[in-house]
Amino acid sequence: GTEIGCFADGTVTARHVGTTTVTATADSGSAACTVEVQPRYNTFVEPAYELIGQTISHAEIDAVEKREKIEETKFSIAYKGELPYIKRVEYFYDVADEDELNAITVRFDKGYESEVKNFLSERYLPVPINAYVINFYTHYETLAAVKVVWSNREKEVVLQYGHNPKQIKQ
């Protein structure tokens, strides 16, 4: 779709990482080709954000999350980052409904601000809020409510995945 790339005047322009099919049509017929936009940044494996808003057990998250579990409470599960600069990946449950996944955070060392922003910009639409917070929204209809907040207020870079701005505290 147009969220991955666009075609105009014979040129395909990449917009975000992903795969799309471009179809050119003329009086003589049409032709289609698949275009795959490869990432420049492979900074980290994104958490299973597609599970946010779903009723899901801790065991089901453990089954999809390949990182090493380091802590678990009734309302959260924390995993060790897969690389030295990733401090922690944490899944949070809704306090009112402890079976519903509410948000996910990923914490990075402070020195990785640019790397993390570039990684997210390849995948999401950035919308700066202020000098410390950038919201990143997906273009995909199936994940239209997913929002990623990037913040460098602390001594680390914090990403928070959630469904809507009300769920994500800035």
Predicted regions, residues:
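Extracytoplasmic soluble-region selector
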Residues: 1-45, 61-62
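Disulfide-bonded cysteine-rich modules in secreted/extracellular proteins
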Residues: 41-56
